[in-house]
Amino acid sequence: MAPLCLRDCKAWQDAGLTLSTTSNEVCKLFDATLTQYATWKNDCTLGGIDGCLSRIKDTDPNFVMGHVAANGLELIGTGRSPRVDKELANAVRVMSDLSKSQALTEREMLHVAAVETFANGNLPKAADLWERILQNHPTDLLALKFAHDCYFYLGEQRQMRDSVARVLPYWKPGTPLSSYVKGMYSFGLLETNFYDQALKVAKEALAVDQTDSWSVHTVAHVHEMRADLDSGLAFMQETENNWKGSDMLACHVYWHWALYFIEKGDYEAALTLYDNHIAPQCFASGTMLDVVDNSSMLYRLQLEGVNVGDRWKNLLQITKSHTQDHMLIFNDLHFLMSSLGSKDEDMTRELVESMQELSKSPGENQQHGLINHLGTPLCRALIEYDRGHYDKAADLMYPIRYQILGIGGSDAQRDLFNQVLIRAAINSSSKYHQNLARCLLTERDMGRPNSPLTQRLIKKCSAGPGILG
């Protein structure tokens, strides 16, 4: 990244995004932070995002937007909970106090309010506040990215798409990072099933910058949702050198690559990608995206009857420290997969009991408000499935299958729960569940024709119960 490309105080003001600091260095470091966030790539020449934020704080400790970016990125990463992490909670308080001690723009005050609101767990209101910023400042990348990620956690697919659609015309080709905004739009199109348009927009973004890993990610998703394995595998292999340097997303793109192999039934190839890329990057970063990818990959392989050895216990070294976080139900379910896979009954019990305790007084925390009708039934379903109580697992999951969207994540990520439900129904001794399995598989085959995984499940369903792990 060339320092000359980074905006100083006047450039931010000219863009209609005035920053309350007199330091040109701080303004450029803030721009560098946003650039790395948008491109999913830490620039080592700048010290990465953490290095930029640290230098901002050292240069102008009263620069509120520096605190907004630092706290917002921690919170949006969902790897730390201000409810249990006192250092993070204090950092949010410091930001709030600073915002009251100086004259800020309305836009900056809304940013502070949005981060405070997200910290309190009120994700829908936080998204609304970021949208208020975008109504008057459509090129505010921090507000756009935070809203985009927030909608992703909420399972609000249309909002995730439309939030970008409303501002995209304001991002001219000469606007810094405009092609990456187009990549964000491609993902929203994908998640609302506009696959052809998603591919078109993603490829337009990649024509500008072939290292745009988020647009690569969109293309990977489209091939996954269409079960177009040959195209997906070819695309991954042909573009790997372009995106593998995106240290914040490469693990997830490798996860998508491994999904193609699981779909094909080539489990050794999937395990090789796991051992060579997915696991090492997770242990290096510890980020939640990488953690849930690891849990999901091992669980999917286990569903296919693959012995994953000690890999669960290795992953537990990371997940166990997050048992009390309860930032997202989506995360909690993946922590649970790791405790079940490791046969750690104490962690399973602690995770579920602490979740249920929070459901008693959720307050404004949107995720805690979902525990009783989504979090607890899904946790119980995974536990019952693990115990071989397939009928109970199916009965817990089937009534809420269309509500599972509310835990967030992508269609590809949540498909794991579809697979668990189908396998539970197949393996149940109940004729009702076996018939349900046939119905669900017919539905799946219609939606994703030519899926080898679906065909394997159809054959197992025809063979009768008792043949799944």
Curated annotation (Swiss-Prot):
Tell me which SUPFAM superfamilies the record gives. Answer: TPR-like
Query: Which parts are the TPR repeats?
Result: 107-140, 179-212, 251-284
Query: Does this UniProt record's set of keywords contain DNA-binding?
Result: no
For this UniProt record, the keywords arranged alphabetically read as follows:
Repeat, TPR repeat
Matching entries from InterPro entries are given as:
TPR-like_helical_dom_sf, TTC38
Q: So what family is this one in?
A: Belongs to the TTC38 family.
- Name of the protein in question: Tetratricopeptide repeat protein 38
Q: Which organism is it from?
A: Xenopus tropicalis
